[in-house]
Amino acid sequence: MQVVGKTTIALHRIAYLIYSYEKEFKPEEFMIIAPNKFFLNYISNILPDLGVNDVKQYTFEDFAYEVIGKKLRIPDNNEKLVMIVNNMVDGSYKDKIDIVLKESIFKSSIDFKKYIDEYLKEIEQKYIPREDFKYNDYKIMDYDEINELFINTYNKYNFKARINEIEKHLTSEFRKKSENIIEKLRNERSKAIENLQGRERAEVFDRFTKEIDLIDKNYKKIIKRYLNTIKDKNCIEYYKDFLENYFLQNIHKKIDDNNSELLQIVEYLRKNTLSNLKNNEFAFEDLAPLMYIQYKIVGIKDKCKIKHVVIDEAQDYGEFQFDVLKTILDSNSMTILGDIAQGVHFYRGIENWKRFIDVEFNDVNVTYTTLQKTYRTTKEIMDIANKVINNLPKYEKEFIVLGEPVIDRKNSVYSKQLSNDKELIKCIDERIKEHMKNGYKSIAIIGKDINECEEIQRQISKIRDDVRLIQGKDSEYNAGISVVPSYLAKGLEFDCVIIANANSEKYSNNTLDVKLLYVAITRAMSKLDIFYTNSKSEILPLDII
């Protein structure tokens, strides 16, 4: 297996920037966001060869945990996709998951971020307790002055940093006014002891004197006691409060009551997310809101400060995910790589690069480049892939750039119709032997989903013991034979690919199936075998027999 193409170009770009602008950039100021551990393993192997092994490397989830400050219990990034695939197969797609898809789309949108911004604005207005800062009955600063500092004077900082600045301000004010307070206490002491004598006079004198002495010693405690009246929460508690109290009430003000579909999505999003939070469970789409709230309230660690970020498989991230990366990293310097034709996470990802650029980067210079020439796979294989992706509806196809293969090698595609699963396994084994005999090192048997792959693995392990099932938790792979679901194969390349069963039951003419089959086909660099039982999928070209 190899990870080449766009990723390799990005890594060489990092090396170029570091060596060409060594005074401006340090390796540790670069970050790569990769889709999975496979990519990270490949990257960590290739970066030392480029001399830039200090570059930070994360999956989006791991970076989110770094920002939030704790690891969250989150399902595998592909779990929702698996659910979609399975429900499409059993025919209950519309009934079971339509609302789930729409929830993901809305949660990944800039609109959802805008509601969180409005919520944080409301929190900001109530953050400072409505009371003056006093020492006993002596007013140091009134509420309006302190609130003005928080809302306006220090508004470029996160909430926690603002409080730190206000603490400095209160300290300065306290010191300025402490002499007046001490003078008042001395006057009060004089009046208090004026008509007293003996022991009683001495006790009252000592009490006032101790209070005067404590002012200078205890001013830090006095300030801390005041600031501790601020009821702070962590980002999860704020997110929960947003969903429980703010979101539903305020969205009704902005949505026409006739827009029942959006109201239904919002209510489902709210109830489903709160139910998950109650069980300390989170979805991938919750990470951007949590990161954003954490950044606005608490801020982030210095080690998250990055000057340039590379985002691979970018088509699978939504607008909110990109926006939060831009905001947190405080940088518009990005290399964004993606292929909409491989956008299997369509329920949250990018469908139109132009719109994406207009939304996310409308205020900066953007260089948009398409890579059309492909040197990895053959013309025969790429022609089939292009014909498959051509099944997409017109409005989706217009944003897809078809690959133009350079290598013109004949007999790189083999296809066969089989009568049953037993015959299928036998044929797969025969093709593996043939490929290994011809010196090919990496061979992938690609099934549509994990269920199909588990069954293939179970059956083929009866006749050979060198086949490994990839389930998404793996962090590395060194050649050999693997069984891999189509959605996990994305971004990877193999010498030979065997598509286990491209029949009409597995792959229908819908956006997801078209993209999954396209991904599977384009993983092959030298040889592509397509098998199917009964009738072949209608999205395969006619010349596949």
Where are these regions (language model features)?
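The conserved Walker
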Residues: 2-3
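Rossmann-like NAD(P)(H) cofactor-binding subdomain of soluble oxidoreductases
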Residues: 6
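Hydrophobic positions on the alpha1 helix immediately C-terminal to the Walker A/P-loop
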Residues: 9, 13
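Alpha-helical nucleic-acid-binding subdomain
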Residues: 18-310, 316-324, 332, 366
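Conserved helicase motor core of SF1/SF2 NTP-dependent helicases
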Residues: 28, 37, 44-45, 49-53, ...
